[in-house]
UniProtKB/Swiss-Prot annotation:
It comes from Mus musculus. Residues 182-212 are cytoplasmic. This is Secreted and transmembrane protein 1b. May be involved in thymocyte signaling. It is a single-pass type I membrane protein. The lineage of its organism: Eukaryota, Metazoa, Chordata, Craniata, Vertebrata. Glycans are attached at N56, N85, N114, N130. Residues 29-160 are extracellular.
Length: 212
């Protein structure tokens, strides 16, 4: 009887300990790592562009903290912010389920810097984004200044007209002179005839050429 009592009293604590270990194991299995997956850490945009930085984790987000670090100072933009939609100055933060998004609709120089994120799900995860805001590479077409091509001065126009008239007059006068000269001094055709008593084709005896 004593042996049975001792055995029973020793078995119960062992079973209780085993159940506690099993519960702890199941709880640890359910609490998976957050494993954040984020957009590109290096972001470079032109001034006025829209910027979206986002992170997803494996568990629902409890809160998010975002700081902007520049060479001059460190500013806390959102601090331990729970799920929801928030806006501060020109920053917008959207937290829903496993995702957090930071949106800048009109990027300016003041938005440049290093964004330090603290994502709190089951654990605390830290992520960094570096945002560089550049001046626009080129102006929009409608913003380009229109340069009017200056008209030619009147003096230049008159000079060109005089030169053209002089060339045309020279050509006309030359043509008229050639025509008149041809009419006054026509080219006389040559007639070849053989002289009697001369042997045609004799060496050294040419034909006699007479004018008409």
């Amino acid at each position: 009887m004593l042996a049975y009592s001792v055995t029973s009293s020793g078995l119960f604590p062992r079973m209780l300990w085993a159940l506690l270990l099993l519960a702890a194991s199941l709880n640890a299995h359910n609490d998976v790592w957050d494993e954040p997956c984020c957009t590109e850490h290096e972001v470079s945009v032109n001034r006025g562009s829209r910027v979206v930085m986002a992170c997803n984790i494996s568990n629902n987000l409890r809160d998010v903290t975002i700081e902007l670090v520049t060479s001059e100072k460190t500013s806390i933009i959102f601090n331990h912010t729970p799920p929801g939609n928030y806006s501060k100055d020109s920053w917008q933060l959207h937290i829903q389920g496993v995702q957090a998004q930071l949106v800048i609709t009109d990027a300016q120089d003041k938005h440049s810097g290093n964004y330090s994120w603290k994502l709190h799900g089951f654990q605390a995860e830290f992520k960094n984004f570096n945002l560089t805001v550049n001046a626009a590479d080129r102006q929009k077409t409608e913003d380009l200044p229109v340069t009017k091509v200056p008209d030619k001065p009147p003096t230049a126009v008159r000079t060109e007209v005089i030169i053209i008239i002089a060339i045309a007059t020279t050509i006309i006068i030359t043509g008229i002179g050639v025509f008149v000269w041809y009419k006054q001094f026509p080219v006389a055709p040559q007639i070849q005839m053989s002289v009697p008593c001369l042997i045609h084709g004799s060496p050294g005896i040419p034909y006699l050429t007479l004018p008409p």
